[in-house]
UniProtKB/Swiss-Prot annotation:
Induction: Highly expressed during syntrophic growth with butyrate (at protein level). Seems to be constitutively expressed.
Residues at the catalytic site: 451
Predominant cellular place of this UniProt entry's protein: cytoplasm
Protein name: Butyryl-CoA dehydrogenase Swol_1933
Pathway: Lipid metabolism; butanoate metabolism
GO molecular function (one): short-chain fatty acyl-CoA dehydrogenase activity
Catalytic activity: butanoyl-CoA + oxidized [electron-transfer flavoprotein] + H(+) = (2E)-butenoyl-CoA + reduced [electron-transfer flavoprotein]; a short-chain 2,3-saturated fatty acyl-CoA + oxidized [electron-transfer flavoprotein] + H(+) = a short-chain (2E)-enoyl-CoA + reduced [electron-transfer flavoprotein]
Subcellular location: Cytoplasm
Enzyme's top EC category: oxidoreductase
InterPro entries, per the entry: Acyl-CoA_dh-like_C_dom, Acyl-CoA_Oxase/DH_mid-dom, Acyl-CoA_Oxase/DH_mid-dom_sf, AcylCo_DH-like_C, AcylCo_DH/oxidase_C, AcylCoA_DH/ox_N_sf, AcylCoA_DH/oxidase_NM_dom_sf, Diverse_Acyl-CoA_DH
Single GO BP term: butyrate metabolic process
């Protein structure tokens, strides 16, 4: 049962996007009202499901082993497994690839409809999905910042998937410290055209044979650049030159110097690249060139970075889902030991054992909580673009910015924990590579590392997002949790609301403690940043899960116990109860630790780490 059998289920996905989120509000916006009704998403989801089941997941076996092969050479350094070609072409031809990122297209889909498509694709093959998702992010930067001439030159073939795209940020000496990039760009006699010289590493989809050209977005500094991130520029550097008419030209002196041998996502080509080894690499500046050594590259790249951080959470969500469904399938079949309540009885399927049920419901609750967080954030992002009222657009943009680090860090952290629980459900077989959870655990670990490690996300959340615009957006974010707890109480969920009320009081104390530390001992904010991000995530996920449970209870009452959907809604209610009563209490532990404010990790001499 290697991860080549697609077990994903769509019922909760459709509940989230069709029943729970206010899709009528979004689809009434000018961008969508003449094109889509709420049921139109079914066709996209159903086609995507078939592609995932019949094409992507079967191809995933070769994605993991043998994966991509590095052969070197200037023109084609990486060979992908043969089955990748059909998978890549099928996705692009079905309109399920980089086309999503074209926000200027007439009749474009909402981003919140993209979320389940990416989730299911990642759940089918975490490796293969990277080949078109990085292209989509690169398109976003070009679309929003480049000249019309450059858009016309590059975007059509990138959107179609004929050309791929990358984000050329990381260097051997510049990982999280982006401002340390050493790659240089030298102006030429042609305005906007620069000669490129430098090295990049860990470049996802840096070279492959699925696209005829790779368009790299490269961060680089001019010789007179200001130090740090303010001196960074972003340039379009194609592997093969692109002529003015959009045709492909000669090799542009972009060399693949090696492929990384990774723990997971073996089917994703992660490369080291060298630009200008022969002094003949050129790229186009995106937007205006630098002024007095100050570039706009970081601001431009962060448009792609924020998109990819949200997508990273969605990729992690796919691994959570596939690992859970693999564990569930196994636990329904595996027979071992009598029930605890009938020790002399026959052996039963392990799903009947208490601790196995706990592990399964933990995974299910994490899957549904993280899905609610992700989809809500995509929904906010859509409204930040498409709502008619400027004040409303600003509000939803603020909410999106606050939640992106939660989506990236919390979901990817929980993917690692949840896939571990899936392995545990399988017992010794979970440790065997022929079973899906082992590969999914290896594959999902990257998500807490790339697009800014999860501590970077925690820094961003606690030091930027909570204080932006004098803290007003964060106050509104907290207030919407308070408003929900004050106005939505239901006697059927009295215990859950009581738990959330207590956790919310604790979270407010966490926030006030953090603000006091900011003034008196900011190093403590760094020390507790990750735990505070998790506390915020548990609070918002608890609220979202309880909101879904209220809707599920209402639907169940309307439909009755005999309805075919009754078990789904009962599962929604039980899963929300579990999350609120078993996961949300983690907020109390964070507050207790913050009250103690233990600084052992800071105080211990380096020499004592032995």
């Amino acid at each position: 049962m290697a991860h080549e059998n697609y077990l994903y289920q769509m019922r909760d996905i459709k509940f989230a996007v069709k029943e729970w989120l206010d899709m009528n509000k979004l689809l009434s916006c000018d961008a969508y009202k003449d094109y889509y009704g709420i049921d139109d998403i079914d066709a996209f989801l159903d086609v995507n499901f078939k592609v995932c089941r019949d094409v992507l997941c079967p191809a995933n076996k070769e994605a993991d082993d043998p994966g991509c092969k590095f052969v070197g050479g200037d023109t084609q350094a990486v060979i992908t497994p043969e089955v990748f070609k059909n998978a890549y072409n099928t996705v692009c031809e079905a309109g399920l690839g980089p086309q999503f990122s074209d926000r200027s297209a007439e009749g474009r889909m909402p981003l919140v409809w993209e979320a389940p498509i990416l989730e299911m694709q990642s759940g089918a093959s975490p490796s293969i999905v990277m080949f078109w998702c990085l292209t989509a992010g690169a398109c976003t930067v070009i679309q929003h910042n480049a000249s019309e001439e450059l858009k016309e030159r590059f975007l059509p073939k990138m959107y179609s998937g004929e050309w791929g795209g990358t984000m050329g940020l990381t260097e051997p000496g510049a990982g999280s410290e982006v401002g340390a990039v050493a790659t240089k760009c030298f102006p030429t006699d042609t305005p906007g055209l620069y000669k490129i010289k430098g090295q990049k590493c860990f470049i996802t989809s840096g070279d492959h044979d699925l696209a005829s050209n790779i368009i790299h977005l490269v961060l680089a500094k001019t010789p007179d650049a200001k130090p740090g991130t303010s001196g960074i520029n972003c340039l379009i550097v194609p592997k093969f030159w692109v002529n003015e008419d959009g045709t492909q030209g000669a090799w542009n002196d972009v060399t693949s110097t090696g492929i990384e041998h990774k723990m997971g996502i073996h089917g994703s080509s992660t490369l080291s690249l060298s630009f200008g080894e022969n002094d003949n690499c050129y790229g186009w500046m995106i937007g205006d060139g630098p002024v007095d050594g100050r570039g706009k590259g970081m601001a431009q790249m962060f448009q792609m970075m924020n998109e990819e951080r949200l997508n990273t959470g969605t990729f992690a969500q796919g691994c959570i889902g596939s690992a859970y469904y693999a564990a569930l399938d196994y636990c329904k079949m595996r027979v071992q030991s009598p029930k605890f309540t009938d020790p002399k009885g026959p052996s039963v399927r392990i799903i009947e054992h208490e601790d196995v049920r706990r592990m399964l419901l933990f995974q299910k609750s994490i899957m549904e909580a993280c899905r609610a967080l992700l989809y809500t954030t995509y929904f906010y992002q859509d409204l930040s673009h498409d709502a008619a009222d400027p004040a409303e657009r600003e509000y939803y943009d603020d909410m999106t910015m606050i939640q992106i680090p939660l989506c990236k860090a919390y979901v990817s952290d929980m993917a690692w924990i949840s896939t571990e629980q899936a392995i545990q459900c399988l017992g010794g077989y979970g440790f065997i590579e022929e079973y899906a959870p082992a590969e999914l655990a290896r594959d999902c670990k990257i998500y807490s590392l790339w697009e800014g490690t999860n501590f970077i996300q925690a820094q961003d959340f606690n030091n930027r997002k909570t204080t932006m615009k004098k803290g007003e957006p964060m106050k509104k974010w907290v207030a919407q949790i308070a408003d929900f707890l004050a106005t939505k109480k239901d006697p059927a969920f009295a215990d859950e609301f009581a738990m959330m009320d207590d956790a919310f009081s604790a979270y407010n104390e966490i926030l006030s403690t953090k603000e006091a530390w900011r003034a008196s001992n900011p190093q403590l904010v760094q020390l507790f940043a990750t735990r505070m991000l998790h506390a915020a995530s548990m609070m918002i996920c608890g609220k979202l899960m309880l909101d879904q449970a209220l809707l599920a209870a209402k639907k169940l009452a309307e439909l009755g116990e005999d309805h075919f959907d009754a078990m789904f809604y009962k599962g929604k209610i039980a899963t929300a109860r579990f999350y609120v009563m078993n996961v949300v209490p983690g907020v109390f532990g964070t507050l207790k630790a913050m009250k103690v404010a233990d600084t052992s990790a800071i105080d211990m001499p380096e020499e004592a780490f032995m």
